[in-house]
C-alpha cells in the first residue's frame, strides 16, 4: 500500500505522501491485479497475507472490502493476515473494520518511545499514541500484535535502549521487530554517517534486553511469536507480490511490479522477470538461513561449501542437527555466509 501521511527520511520503500487523490483508481488496479495473479497461478488456498507499505492505515478501511471479497474464500481459520499500521492513523474504528474483514495480526510502526528520536526519524506520532494504538488493537480483538523499533541511531545509548525494552514489558504484545538503522541510498539519511552509531555492542545489548523482556529471537531482527509470513520468505517459499513496488517469487523467478503509482494504475499486471540461477538460489538460502532459525540444508551445498561449514561446526561457530547447519549468533550471519559461500 504505497500511501503515507508523511515520508520518513530513512525509508527507501516505494511510497508517496502526496497522491491520496489516486487511492480509488489504485484500488481498482489492485483488485484487477490480485484477481489476475490468483487465477493465473491457480491459487486455491492462502496461508499468509501481508498488507505492507507505505502505510495501510493511511487509507480508509472501507477500501479493503472489495479486496477481501476475493481473498476471504481462499483463506482458512489458520491463515495469518497482517496489516501494517501507524499509531497515529490506526484508530479504533479502522482497527475494528479490518478485524471484521479477517485481519488477525497487526504491526505498528512505533520505532521509538523517545520523543526526540521519533522527531529525528520523521515520525508523526507520539509515545502516548503508541500505547493508545496497542490498547485499541486489543479493544478491536487483536491478540497477535507486533511493534517495530529502530536502534543504533545517534540518540541511542545502553541506558536509552534499556528504557525502550522496559516499555515493551508494559505493553501486551506478542512480537517485536528491532531494526538497526540503515542509511539507505536515495533517502535524506543517505551518507549521514553521524546519524548512526554503527555499534556491535549496542546491537548485542538490544538483542539481550529484548529477550529479557520475554521475546525470543528467531531472526536477526525478529523476536517473539513467529510471523509465518516472514518465515516463508526465509524458507524460500513461493509468494505473490500485488500492488505498486511489489515483488513476488514463484519457482525460482522473481517478479517486479511497476515502481510508480501512475504506472501501476495503467498496467497493474505488468511484471519484470528475474530468473535466478541455481547458484543464486543457494546463495539466498545460505544468507537467509543463517540469519534465522531456518538454517541451511547441507544437501544444498557443494562439497567445498560443506567442508567450510563443517569447519565452523568444529570451531563452535555453527551447530549441525538433522541435516542442517544452524547459526547460534545471528549478528555474525553475513560473515559466516560469505565464508561458507567461498
Question: Could you tell me what each predicted segment is?
Answer:
Residues 2-13:
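Local cysteine-cluster metal-coordination motifs and their immediate loop/turn environment
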Residues 12, 16-39, 47-300:
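C-terminal scaffold of the Radical SAM
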Residues 302-315:
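Short amphipathic alpha-helical interaction segments
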Residues 329-342:
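Short, amphipathic alpha-helical interaction segments positioned at domain boundaries
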